[in-house]
């Protein structure tokens, strides 16, 4: 009987620990996401504390592949408040992403095609690890954005009309 109780607790703690810490909604508007990959991030201690507190901005972020490694640029992680200025990290430093070699090579071949880029979509906790979702996206033109917005608006209207009846 105690095993069943422990099993319930572990399921609850796993569900609680898999939570989204930051999301890049702007990337989904600017890019048509073709594929997404989950990767780890190489972080410093104060960066981990800041991310867990929700002090991260993914909006201007992008990823590059240099010398076979995946690098995250322009993601702002605010300095941790309770650490002294000497021990804190640089907010916009380049961070290495941890992914399998096959995934990196596959992404590199796709990025070399015209018009594709790697953008961070969200940062989340997976157990005690901080992970990031990287999206392979193709930039949208202005008319594509307008068309997408019209489609979403019509879906909202239909949904609200069905809710009334």
Curated annotation (Swiss-Prot):
GO terms for cellular component: cytosol. InterPro entries: SmpB, SsrA-bd_prot, SsrA-bd_prot_CS. Residues 144-159 have a biased composition (Basic and acidic residues). It comes from the Bacteria. Keywords: Cytoplasm, RNA-binding. Pfam families: SmpB. Its main location: cytoplasm. Gene3D superfamilies: 2.40.280.10. Residues 141-165 are annotated as: Disordered. PROSITE patterns: SSRP. GO terms for biological process: trans-translation. CDD domains: SmpB (cd09294). It is found in: Cytoplasm. GO terms for molecular function: RNA binding. HAMAP family: SmpB. Belongs to the SmpB family. Required for rescue of stalled ribosomes mediated by trans-translation. Binds to transfer-messenger RNA (tmRNA), required for stable association of tmRNA with ribosomes. tmRNA and SmpB together mimic tRNA shape, replacing the anticodon stem-loop with SmpB. tmRNA is encoded by the ssrA gene; the 2 termini fold to resemble tRNA(Ala) and it encodes a 'tag peptide', a short internal open reading frame. During trans-translation Ala-aminoacylated tmRNA acts like a tRNA, entering the A-site of stalled ribosomes, displacing the stalled mRNA. This is SsrA-binding protein. It comes from Prochlorococcus marinus (strain SARG / CCMP1375 / SS120).
